[in-house]
Design a protein with these regions (language model features):
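Signature of N6-adenine DNA methyltransferases within the class I
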Residues: 3-4, 8-17, 37-45, 83, ...
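Conserved S-adenosyl-L-methionine
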Residues: 4, 9-116, 179-182
Length: 227
């Protein structure tokens, strides 16, 4: 699918805020977690670190922690280089905590076409920012045929990521996404806003902070929390 994407990863302080806002801090064992465009693991590694610290605080054995990591965490990354970096970063984290390697459920694939037969308690992410003009015709066709928010008009690449995440979210689950502010005003995001209107619990505006100013011009961001 769309490999010509913008690879800009999430700053650590924003990662922590997103996880804090959805209360990813306690009673984490057995709670499923998905990051669907994980890059080199900025968000995923912090979530895994919190999970391990919680388990150790509860006195869980290393074997039980490893089992939980294999069952509770899923991630997807299309770019092969970032996919390998993410696995290496996660394995380094295991080593830091004195844990053996685990079989991570991380997929080097396109989230939009991948089938995951599971729903999640937590979905956190920073989906790729790609405008309609930079999506090739094949991908436009696939997205338009498979996502209600993209049936009409000039959708951005993050729209189907948001819609698909809602499908994977458990009832009562929580989602935190870092997204461009234009979805709140773009005429072509009207159908996406309809999908979101009864589900949003909080919106944080980072326009003044300019999280990605070093890398991207004309992109303001907001964190969107759904419950």
């Amino acid at each position: 699918m769309e490999k010509n994407r913008c690879h800009v990863f999430t700053p650590a302080h924003i990662v922590n805020k997103m996880l804090d806002e959805i209360n990813y801090v306690d009673k984490l064992y057995g709670k499923t977690f998905l990051e669907n465009s994980c890059g080199d693991g900025q968000i995923l590694c912090e979530a895994v670190n919190r999970y391990i610290l919680y388990c150790k605080k509860e006195g869980f054995t290393d074997e039980k922690i490893a089992c939980g990591l294999e069952q509770d965490f899923y991630a997807v990354e299309l770019d092969e280089v970032n996919f390998e970096k993410c696995k290496n970063n996660l394995n380094s984290l295991l080593d830091l905590h004195g844990l053996k390697l685990v079989n991570w459920n991380i997929f080097n694939s396109d989230f939009l076409s991948l089938k995951i037969h599971k729903k999640f308690d937590f979905i956190v992410g920073n989906p790729p920012y790609v405008s309609y003009v930079n999506i090739n015709s094949e991908n436009r066709k696939f997205i338009r045929e498979n996502f209600e928010s993209c049936k009409k008009g000039k959708f951005d690449y993050c729209y189907p990521f948001i819609e698909l995440s809602l499908r994977y979210l458990k009832s009562g689950g929580k989602l935190a996404y870092l997204i461009p502010t234009n979805i709140f005003k773009n005429v072509f995001a009207k159908d996406l806003r309809k999908l979101l209107q009864d589900k949003v619990s909080k919106i944080f505006d980072f326009k003044k902070i300019k999280i990605f100013a070093k890398f991207m011009k004309n992109v303001a961001t907001r964190s969107l929390n759904l419950t």
